[in-house]
Regions:
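Active-site cofactor/cluster-binding pocket
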Residues: 1-106, 110-112
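Thiamine diphosphate
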Residues: 117-214, 223-244, 397
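Short beta-strand segments
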Residues: 5, 164, 187-190, 226, ...
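Gly-rich Lys/Arg/Thr-decorated short loops/hinges at beta-loop-alpha junctions or inter-strand turns
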Residues: 47, 71-88, 103-108, 127-133, ...
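Short hydrophobic alpha-helical runs that function as membrane-insertion/retention elements
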Residues: 112, 138, 160-162, 186-189, ...
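Acidic-glycine-rich active-site phosphate/pyrophosphate-binding loop
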Residues: 1-4, 37-38, 70-81, 117-130, ...
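Short helix/loop capping segments that flank catalytic or ligand/cofactor-binding pockets
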Residues: 112, 121, 172, 197-198, ...
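Flexible, low-complexity linker and terminal segments
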Residues: 92-96, 100-106, 236, 241-499
Length: 499
């Protein structure tokens, strides 16, 4: 709290009580480094019709607020506004709009979906860009058909995607497995909402992580991404296509209802600097030794590549004729159910995840760990990560040693990265907006870490103070090293007053 005598300054220095709000603006400017010249431009635009005298008076009020802060207050927090980057360099987008723009920037050519809250607007935003680029948008009869169409379009050579929410993701489970089995690249955007069943269609939750990671019968390679902001949604959409195309597998991108409607300003993406990855296509002219041809048959699922990635054939290419089927198959795509072929083909498919972890994983992990012996290390994802960043800043300004890790690639998991981060902190806290603590459970399953899980599931995101409060609670209770906690543990009966 910073006390500033706004009324006194306005009355006695400026001689105009009505300027109290401008004095307050000056105080905020002094405290948080707001752009003075931009504010003066706004004052001039607002008051110029009332004459130069009024404009000058408001300038004085602004300066008076700034000067009071400089001369009388000691700043106790670490917050300030970054220098403005200029309106011409800024775009303002909602989360779903950023996803749509990112998918188009990645080269998306086909979009099929069935309308569902809160994912519908992804299609609304993407349609104009697709039409302009001779792409296709199709409203399917249901979510099952929409993913089937996207897989078919991808098999035909197009970069393809669908978008849905939790109920639709449930319906897509079999075709997610089909995309993994056939090694077909496809992007699935899941704008999460409160479940199960119809749940609360317009409310926020991070409840679909288990389904994204494990959904479908059997086991397939897949990647699961989660942006942490609107700006991040643009770039993670590009990365979703890059991973799908490079590793020929389904990639699920988890966002949520709150982020889908949230508008943010961020620097205009420079499309020329984006790294765009395209799939490996069979080219008979490059395959001089005919490594991928045996007995006149194209080896779509050849077993001899070190990373499991084999060239895809485009329908119509007489040199790359093959079948696509959900049945297990041998190298030339003919169905087979021999134990040895099954084992070899499973190993081939999962080699791709090994390559992903080796070549691409690290850039998806943001680690903010300035302390070697932090009081608490926080790991979290999605919108909760964005909120946690503000809480971490506040906690550090109070002298607490807090490290943080924000994974954007939630599956596969590179265990040693989590283990390395955990060594820098005495305890690990994982806040999430779901009941089980889904990321916390995955971390426990894949690593030796035993985190403290903090969960809310009321249909709303955390606020930064709630992250601060759980950290304060843990600092007061040093004996707590693991377990699951909810607001009731922190606030008692008052917890329900937060809802």
């Amino acid at each position: 709290v910073y006390p500033v005598p706004l009324s006194d300054i306005a009355k006695n220095q400026i001689k105009a009580y009505i300027t109290k709000n401008i004095v307050a603006l000056g105080a905020l400017t002094g405290l948080f480094n707001l752009p003075v010249e931009s504010l003066k431009d706004s004052i001039k635009a607002k008051f110029s019709r009332k004459g130069e005298k009024i404009v000058s008076m408001n300038y004085q009020a602004l300066e008076a607020g700034i000067n009071y802060v400089k001369e009388n207050l000691v700043k106790k927090d670490g917050f300030e506004f970054p220098p403005p980057i200029g309106l011409k360099d800024v775009v303002i987008m909602e989360g779903n709009q950023a996803i749509a723009k990112g998918c188009v920037a990645a080269g998306c050519q086909f979009y099929a979906a069935y309308p569902i809250t809160p994912a519908t607007s992804v299609g609304n935003y993407i349609v104009e860009d697709l039409i302009r680029k001779d792409g296709w948008l199709y409203q399917a009869e249901d979510e099952i058909a929409s993913l089937a169409m996207a897989i078919g379009a991808s098999f035909a050579g197009a970069k393809a995607m669908t978008a849905t929410s939790g109920p639709g993701l449930s319906l897509m489970s079999e075709f997610i497995g089909y995309a993994g089995m056939t090694e077909t690249p496809v992007v699935i955007v899941d704008v999460q909402r409160v479940g199960p069943a119809t749940g609360m269609p317009t409310k926020h939750e991070q409840g679909d992580l288990y389904h994204a990671v494990y959904g479908s019968h059997g086991e397939i390679p897949r990647a699961v991404l989660a942006p942490i902001s609107v700006e991040d949604s643009f770039y993670m959409a590009v990365e979703a296509f890059n991973l799908a195309e490079k590793y020929q597998m389904p990639v699920i991108m988890l966002t949520d209802a709150a982020m889908s409607l949230r508008a943010e300003a961020f620097p205009t993406p420079d499309l020329s600097k984006l790294n765009i990855v395209n799939r490996l296509i069979y080219n008979s002219e490059e395959d001089k030794e005919q490594k991928f041809i045996r007995h006149g048959r194209f080896l779509r699922y050849a077993l001899f590549t070190e990373d499991g990635i084999t060239p895809m054939g485009i329908p119509g290419d007489p040199n790359a004729i093959h079948a696509i089927t959900g049945l297990e198959r041998q190298e030339n795509s003919d169905p087979r159910n021999r134990p040895d072929i099954r084992t070899y083909q499973m190993n081939k498919r999962f080699k791709k995840l090994e390559k992903l972890l080796e070549e691409d994983y690290d850039r998806f992990i943001e680690i903010d760990a300035p302390y070697k012996d932090a009081d608490i290390g926080i790991i979290t994802w999605g919108l909760t990560a964005s909120i946690t960043k503000e809480a971490v800043q506040r906690l550090r300004s109070r002298g607490l040693k807090i490290n943080a890790m924000y994974p954007r690639l939630l599956w596969p998991v590179k265990e040693d990265v989590f283990e390395f981060f955990a060594k820098s902190s005495k305890r690990i806290l994982i806040p999430e907006t779901n009941y089980y603590g889904q990321l916390a459970t995955i971390v426990k399953d894949r690593t030796h870490i035993r985190p403290i899980s903090y969960n809310i599931y009321r249909g709303e995101p955390f606020i930064p103070k709630e992250i601060e409060d759980i950290v304060d609670f843990l600092m007061e209770n040093q004996e707590i090293t693991e377990g699951r906690f909810t607001p009731e543990h922190i606030y008692g009966e008052k917890a329900y007053g937060l809802i």
